[in-house]
Amino acid sequence: LLQALAIVRKRYPDVKLYVGRKDYGRIPPLARNAYERYIHRLLRESDLYDHVVFTGSLNAQQMKERYLKSQVFVLPSSIENSPNSLGEAMLLGVPCIASDVGGVRCLMTHGAEGLIYPADDPHLLAYDICEMFAHPEKAAQMARAGREHAGKTHDAQKNLEILHQIYTEIAR
């Protein structure tokens, strides 16, 4: 995502990425683990510190507010199964871009409810982000379709009934 952000910034110099995590730059260098050092180096080398906002831990209401203020939600995972964050963003009607991993295609149809890109392709991710920014009406259309789809796949009562049916069949 940071590699894609460096590309997006060339076209949208005011772009901001909000990350629900502690600020890597505020961690003393000797206290950083390998991943934190890697992220800090990427931020520094790409001159992205002014474009990334680390929100720290957020409660449910703060998360909802952050989602709703976002022009696009990006799930850049390299490993996922059924990502809750993608479902949350879709339920809130936020335009979504997700890496093509795990169960993402079960939650979202590429081009209809959001955009799906190869997890190892920051250039395509950057392109997709720029497309969402450049075509807000298309992004809003996908977000509406995503919200409708997520409303079906994340219906707690319906999912409980399906689970009950499965266990009833197993118990027979």
Where are these regions (language model features)?
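Aromatic "clamp/platform" in nucleotide-sugar-dependent glycosyltransferases that forms part
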Residues: 78
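Glycosyltransferase donor-sugar binding loop
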Residues: 16-37
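A short, well-ordered alpha-helix in the C-terminal region of glycosyltransferases
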Residues: 124, 131, 138-153, 159-165
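Short hydrophobic beta-strand element within catalytic cores of glycosyltransferases
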Residues: 95-98, 108
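Nucleotide-activated donor-binding/catalytic signature segment of Leloir-type glycosyltransferases, i.e.
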Residues: 31-58
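Short alpha-helical donor nucleotide-sugar binding micro-motif in glycosyltransferases
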Residues: 57, 65-70
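A short hydrophobic beta-strand element within the catalytic core of glycosyltransferases
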Residues: 73-74
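Conserved acidic donor-binding segment of nucleotide-sugar-dependent glycosyltransferases
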Residues: 110-111, 115-122, 131-136
